[in-house]
Amino acid sequence: MPDARALGAAQLWIGTSWKMNKGLAESRGYARELAEYVAAKPPAGVQPFIIPSFTALTTVRDALGDDSPVLLGVQNAHWEDHGAWTGEVSVAQAKDAGAQIVEIGHSERREHFGETVETTRLKVAAALHHGLVPLLCIGESAENKQAGESSRFILEQAAGALEGLTDEHLARVLIAYEPIWAIGENGRPATVEELRQPFDDLAREYGCRTMGLLYGGSVNTDNAEDLLGIDHVTGLFIGRAAWQLPGYVRILEMAAAHPKAKA
């Protein structure tokens, strides 16, 4: 697998997190078929990545193979390298198991597991220290949106997590904008018009300084092409639409055919 420190050539990032889904057999089968697909049809200008469960991490790593262009991530990691943190997995341990990306700050972790601005900052710093790519998830609630506070809220989330980083560090960070009201089984797909302002705001602050600005939230094969067409969007972070390989492959193909992949 490629070294995360050497990334950045891809024009579009297309990834999926499996959340708490898929056992070892299903994970292995998905990864093997994906490895075969990208070997036969490399998606030019596109960086694929998948984020399985911790228990399937090494299984997926082995199924993808050493030379796979597909990057592998974890859904969370602790900032300390080791210690009395029962139930946690450190960034260092995740890297040792094959991870190249660390998903940080997903809204479900903020809501259910007490993730804060401070812990996201610590995790981003730890990921960078160990040469992994932090995938920082930010997004506002429906209440924030209705109050007209979307841009302020997401910019504050990003600023808190990225505080103190140099431009060299920021160049190794991915930001995924995932409005809470648009994600999950009951999420409402955001319209292109609803997404223009948030991405304009993020691009003004971080667009040329980070590795990429991704969108996640009810992404599927019907809307992926339109979402990629939004100014400043340089990738998609997909949920259930990519949990079956044909859906993920279809979106990879859309991305590879998109003008942004050829820029």
Curated annotation (Swiss-Prot):
- Superkingdom of the source? Bacteria
The answer to keyword Isomerase applying to this record is: yes
Q: Give me the Gene Ontology terms describing cellular component.
A: cytosol
Q: Which GO terms describe its biological process?
A: carbohydrate catabolic process; carbohydrate utilization; gluconeogenesis; glyceraldehyde-3-phosphate biosynthetic process; glycerol catabolic process; glycolytic process
- What InterPro entries does the entry give? Aldolase_TIM, TIM_sf, Triosephosphate_isomerase, Triosephosphate_isomerase_AS
Which GO molecular function annotations are given, in alphabetical order? racemase and epimerase activity, acting on carbohydrates and derivatives; triose-phosphate isomerase activity
Q: Which residues form the signal peptide?
A: none
Name the Enzyme Commission number(s) assigned to this protein: 5.3.1.33
What is stated as this protein's family in its record? Belongs to the triosephosphate isomerase family.
**Could you identify this protein by its name?**
L-erythrulose-1-phosphate isomerase
